[in-house]
A protein has these predicted regions:
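Positively charged, polar, low-complexity stretches
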Residues: 2-43, 47-85
Length: 85
């Protein structure tokens, strides 16, 4: 397994096992919709994003409250536009 595949597997796993079912559903859906469209650098940023706590991610997604610990505009824009199917 190469580094890119390993990183993708890590991201998929971390998006699916967050701590709350709501975050599991949101982030699993979000990650699966974008993971194959991101560059290696963007995947690293997504991995960093997944270090943010669930409350910050939820507040950003639902209320558009900025996440002070993460500032990548592309990832945040993709999340804000994401709709769970």
């Amino acid at each position: 397994m190469n580094e890119l595949e390993s990183l993708k597997k890590k991201i998929i796993y971390r998006s699916a096992y967050r701590g709350t079912k709501e975050m599991d559903l949101l982030l699993t859906s979000f990650v699966s919709s974008i993971i194959n469209t991101l560059s290696h650098i963007e995947l690293r940023k997504l991995d960093i994003f997944l270090n943010c706590n669930d409350e910050d991610i939820s507040n950003f997604y639902l209320n558009k409250i900025p996440i002070t610990t993460f500032d990548d505009a592309k990832i945040l824009n993709l999340l804000s536009c994401h709709k769970i199917k």
